[in-house]
């Protein structure tokens, strides 16, 4: 178990056969290749996908991104799931002076309370091993805290302290770690309501909400749907090396569907 925690793919109990070893090796290679392929695809998506649309809302968002890219201000992006919050955050990073540095995402909604601080701050172990958290991995770059409303309430005070001091300690660590990051947060919930209900710290909210961006569902800007269809047909065809699919943009279902996620 300790070996796997430190990075081993699998352990084999004695006695073992040649076939079993080959099977584990093949599975490890397959896992490695899948991760490599995933990284390549994500890198292509990061550098190729654009914020598509001609609606007044998208034009406004593009202008805001242009302004924010020239600053290091914290940004809070609000909007329903699937409205493009991560894409906006990536565009701000890509157009900023930090574009050559890491863009790290930590999704608060996917983490349990006990593991959140470990994922954010990292952890030190008695044997000297270090598990680096999102803050350190994002140093000099941009950290996106996705679904920031889901940060455990007890952890919110520690996040606030990092924003004030620009330093933190790893779990089980005694040394202060200084970081230089741009923080972007996103949420699909109303943080003002959570503050009123004492579910989110008001002081942290104001620290995060320096430059707010509001995004709406695609259902409120249906004039962008034909452009998005055209764009994604071309991009996905290019990435996957397949012929562009035929899609009838006159189909009413495209404009009445609520496009969740």
Residue ranges of predicted features:
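Flexible nucleotide-interacting loop at or near the entrance of a catalytic core
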Residues: 18-80
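Nucleotide-binding/hydrolysis machinery
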Residues: 19, 23-29, 54-57, 70, ...
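CheY-like receiver
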Residues: 2-6, 18-34, 40, 63, ...
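Conserved post-Walker A coupling segment in P-loop NTPases
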Residues: 13-16, 64-127, 136-152, 217-222
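Conserved AAA+/SF3 P-loop NTPase catalytic/coupling segment centered on the Walker-B
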Residues: 75, 91, 113-118, 130-166, ...
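Conserved phosphate-coupling serine/threonine residues in phosphotransfer and NTP-handling enzymes
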Residues: 1, 81, 187
